[in-house]
Design a protein with these regions (language model features):
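Generic cytosolic/nucleocytoplasmic N-terminal low-complexity/intrinsically disordered segments
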Residues: 4-7, 25, 175
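N-terminal leader/targeting pre-sequences
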Residues: 30-185
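Generic hydrophobic-segment detector
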Residues: 10-12, 22, 71, 101
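C-terminal segment of classical bacterial N-terminal signal peptides
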Residues: 21-29
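Bacterial N-terminal signal peptides that target proteins for export
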Residues: 2-15
Length: 185
């Protein structure tokens, strides 16, 4: 009887120790903290045209838990009732390099808008299977989704290709304030 109690205590101690070590060495716990950063106007003409523009990106790294991270972008001081296309990019300035289109948001009558995207953000990359080159996408940039919407800021600008229909305006906000580094790991 006494040997059974000793054995039960041994197994209980082992279970508690295993659980404790799992909590201490769990890699998910080390990477699960949300982090945020600000975007700035993508160019001097945009900064002049939208002097109150502010955009905040918050990333919730949850890929190890949910299979995806969450990126939340909140902006204000933009053009009212305007749609913007959001991308992860290799570089925050032209020519931008490799990019990934992740979503759109439309501002309200006060120039405020937001978007929440579930995707792999913390480890986003583009891969060229022909060259074998992997390119990390460590920046966030958003463009005017309609080329006509940027005309007050950058008159006569040529349409860019940063939208789902292949035609956009100029870049509005970017993470260029992190150069030469990047805000995403």
């Amino acid at each position: 009887m006494q040997s059974i109690n000793i054995m039960k205590r041994h197994w209980l101690s082992l279970a508690i120790a295993t659980f404790g070590l799992t909590l201490i060495f769990n890699p998910v716990a080390a990477h699960a903290e949300p982090f945020g950063f600000n975007l700035v106007p993508a160019s001097d003409p945009i900064a002049t045209c939208l002097p109150d523009a502010v955009a905040r990106v918050t990333v919730f790294p949850r890929e190890e838990i949910r299979g995806v991270d969450t990126l939340e972008l909140r902006a204000h001081g933009l053009r009212p009732n305007t749609t913007f296309a959001v991308f992860l990019t290799e570089m925050p300035v032209p020519p931008f390099g490799a990019v990934q289109y992740i979503g759109d948001f439309t501002t309200n009558a006060h120039g405020t808008g937001s978007v929440r995207v579930d995707a792999i953000i913390d480890e986003a990359f583009a891969f060229n299977n022909i060259t074998g080159v992997r390119t990390d996408l460590n920046h966030v940039v958003f463009w005017f989704a309609d080329p006509a919407d940027d005309e007050d800021c950058v008159p006569g600008s040529a349409p860019a290709h940063f939208d789902g229909d292949g035609e956009s305006g100029v870049a509005a906000m970017s993470s260029k304030n992190f150069l030469p580094g990047a805000p995403l790991p």
